[in-house]
């Protein structure tokens, strides 16, 4: 079983969030073609993928503009920040026993896993393989 916690966008000032989203936005690493089923086995050609990436970033620009408009109306950050979430990175702390991690890696490092979680799971597996656990005294 995992125990996890993630940083809350509700706690971050909107302008700080906007700055993060402008400087280092999340951009998809896999632009899959539309097809039946849960997996996009085929990817868009390079030119179409670049067009999608540009459109993704234009959507970010439009959302930032609209967030600032709503802030001008007095909207609280807990709502305004929600609109920025598709482009933001978050910090998550996860703990689990060996069985939980082995199960997670079996499912999420699998070739049919969603590409973005597959990438993150692979990175976590690599870090875990290099970790040397230390028993702490009470």
Question: Predicted segments — roles?
Answer:
Residues 1-138:
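A conserved ligand/cofactor-binding region detector
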